[in-house]
Amino acid sequence: VNKLYKEDRVKFITQGNFLIDKARDLYRLPVEAPIKYFPNPVDIDPEFDVETYPKKDSIIFIGRIESVKRGWLFCEIAKRMPEYQFYMLGQTFREKSRNESIMNKYHTGIPNLHFTGHVEGKEKFNYIRDAKIMVNTSIHEALPITFLEALAYGTLLVSCQNPENLTEKFGIYTGTVLGDGFDSIDLFVNAIRTLMTDEDKRKKLSVEGHSYV
């Protein structure tokens, strides 16, 4: 990539300003190398009213069911918060048998945890619209389009990733979570409970997140 840049055969764009320095380091680019900001396009529902829509006491996870996403943390959170409904949207792709073997034990015995499989389009947006919080437990992220899709419906963020400071602005950033994350489950539980039990704060952040998108 560095060679292509020097030959003026490649241009750089980014979905998040926080990625610019990372790109310069990764590709050994000079400080003056132009990297233009191109925000992700997000579908906006013109009929959705963030101030009046009756959200449910539901919490969602959207992503591939793979080790890098650490979906088992979402399941453990659900186990500790039986008063809320948890919906896991996604399926396994790479290392399918290994990832399924890790998650199999969570498919029974947790009545408030629901596995939807892969969903898209209207069905996916229905889950996002109804949820009060989206949880992200990934080891690393750039700027997930799901963060923006969630905010477009006033759904707050709880995550150990904070791209563009979106999580701390429109939800709660747990801080860095290393390894398998089992020792940090309470960070997510406490963050979710803080938002779910303070309706005034939740609604305020919900409106602000929607306006941001």
Segments from the language model and where they lie:
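Short hydrophobic beta-strand element within catalytic cores of glycosyltransferases
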Residues: 156-160
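Aromatic "clamp/platform" in nucleotide-sugar-dependent glycosyltransferases that forms part
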Residues: 139
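Acidic anion/phosphate-binding donor-loop and adjacent secondary structure
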Residues: 24, 36-57
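Nucleotide-activated donor-binding/catalytic signature segment of Leloir-type glycosyltransferases, i.e.
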Residues: 100-119
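A conserved mid-protein helix/loop that constitutes part of the nucleotide-sugar donor-binding site
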Residues: 66-80
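A short, active-site helix/loop in glycosyltransferases that binds the activated sugar's phosphate group
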Residues: 2-34, 42-44
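A short, well-ordered alpha-helix in the C-terminal region of glycosyltransferases
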Residues: 194, 201-213
